[in-house]
């Protein structure tokens, strides 16, 4: 049976968090262009995972500078750039994503994929996960996701690793993570 015409996935990208996690936690420096996620792959994964159209919203902090070439590239990939501004002490991207998640909860329809590691969204994500008939997923690096978010997997939150599941990168990232024994390959160590 086909999905209703109104079925769609809302893909919310916390651009600041993904970039900071990649640079600060994994690379220890600003990522080079070839080390950044391929956002078209993220969009395609979001479409394919639940086999329905995707509405991509890419949240950016534009308080001090808006990288127009990047914004134009994101728009060309069918994301809607959401540049935000505010005082330096205000986490404008977090506030906007929280409000969007709350609005989606009130809306009552639409599946949600959130690309972030930030536990500040836990209460809004929990409300969506607990809503009947709604699918909710988190995109990021599993080992760096907030425990406040990952504990929601017991209630149905799906985790999608940006490197392993989404294949959003064209280079291998220097990650240290637990390897499920069924995926352990000694040849990867022996090279």
Language-model features, listed with the residues they occupy:
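Nuclease catalytic cores that cleave nucleic-acid phosphodiester bonds
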Residues: 64-191
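Domain-level signal for Mg2+-assisted phosphodiester chemistry and nucleotide/NA-binding surfaces
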Residues: 1-91
């Amino acid at each position: 049976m086909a999905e209703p015409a109104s079925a769609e996935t809302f893909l919310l990208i916390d651009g600041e968090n993904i970039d900071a996690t990649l640079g600060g936690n994994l690379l220890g420096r600003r990522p080079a262009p070839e080390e950044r996620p391929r956002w078209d792959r993220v969009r395609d994964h979001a479409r394919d995972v639940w086999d329905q159209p995707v509405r991509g919203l890419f949240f950016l902090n534009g308080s001090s500078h808006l990288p127009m070439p990047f914004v134009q590239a994101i728009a060309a990939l069918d994301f809607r750039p959401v540049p935000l501004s505010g005082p330096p002490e205000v986490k404008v991207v977090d506030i906007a994503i929280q409000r969007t998640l709350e609005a989606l909860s009130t809306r009552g329809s639409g599946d949600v994929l959130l690309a972030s590691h930030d536990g500040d969204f836990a209460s809004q994500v929990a409300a969506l996960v607990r809503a009947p008939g709604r699918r909710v997923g988190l995109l990021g690096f599993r080992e760096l996701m907030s425990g406040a978010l990952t504990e929601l997997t017991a209630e149905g939150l799906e985790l999608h690793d940006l490197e392993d599941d989404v294949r959003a990168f064209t280079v291998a990232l220097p990650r240290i993570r637990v390897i499920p024994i069924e995926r352990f390959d000694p040849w990867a160590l022996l090279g």
